[in-house]
């Protein structure tokens, strides 16, 4: 199983390859706000652990194992963003919140969150009811804060 740091790299590499057809060390370093030498070290580790095939000066590609993990990590990230949106988290907080929690949830928890997201998506009235509850809760918090 990859470490949280390895997951971050695999997710970025997967997204870059999906969007551009390739992933360069410089783009990965920029996306993760790390030094290119750190990316090179991690790429070598991911190669050793068979998540990607790396040839010095020639680049790298994800292995089938790396692609499978990458797909699952992107799914997890998107699912958590959707979940936080449904439960009314402010848009400006969603990305950072997902980054803060995604590595700390088991896949069982992710699957249950997926079930919950599907439950809400299956019937728009459920989302409306939840938004009503959130609005009432926010009003109570504001009233309490004003006292």
From Swiss-Prot:
Keywords from the named record: Activator, Cytoplasm, DNA-binding, Manganese, Metal-binding, Repressor, Transcription, Transcription regulation
InterPro entries: DtxR_MntR_Metal-Reg, Fe_dep_repressor, Fe_dep_repressor_sf, HTH_DTXR, HTH_tscrpt_reg_MntR, Iron_dep_repressor, WH-like_DNA-bd_sf, WH_DNA-bd_sf
Compartments where found: Cytoplasm
PROSITE patterns registered for this protein in UniProt: HTH_DTXR
Documented activity regulation: DNA binding is strongly activated by Mn(2+).
Keyword Transmembrane among UniProt keywords: no
Binding site for Mn(2+) 1: 8, 99, 102-103
All copies of domain HTH dtxR-type, residue ranges: 1-63
Bilayer-spanning residue ranges: none
GO process annotations (BP): intracellular manganese ion homeostasis
Signal peptide from the UniProt entry: none
Residues engaged in binding Mn(2+) 2: 11, 77, 99, 102
GO CC annotations on file: cytoplasm
Record function comment: Central regulator of manganese homeostasis.
Family membership: Belongs to the DtxR/MntR family.
Subunit structure: Homodimer.
Name under which the protein is recorded: HTH-type transcriptional regulator MntR
Gene: mntR
């Amino acid at each position: 199983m990859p470490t949280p740091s390895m997951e971050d790299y695999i997710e970025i590499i997967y997204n870059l390859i999906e969007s551009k057809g390739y992933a360069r060390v410089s783009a990965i370093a920029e996306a993760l706000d790390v030094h290119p030498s750190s990316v090179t070290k991690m790429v070598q580790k991911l190669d050793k652990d068979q998540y990607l095939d790396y040839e010095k000066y020639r680049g790298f590609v994800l292995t089938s194992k790396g692609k499978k993990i990458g797909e699952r990590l992107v799914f997890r990230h998107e699912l958590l963003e959707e979940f936080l949106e449904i439960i009314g988290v402010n848009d400006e907080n969603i990305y950072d919140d997902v980054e803060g929690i995604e590595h700390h949830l088991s896949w069982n928890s992710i699957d249950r969150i997926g079930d919950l997201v599907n439950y809400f998506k299956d019937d728009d009235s459920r989302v409306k009811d939840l938004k009503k509850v959130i609005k009432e809760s926010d009003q109570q918090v504001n009233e309490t804060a004003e006292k």
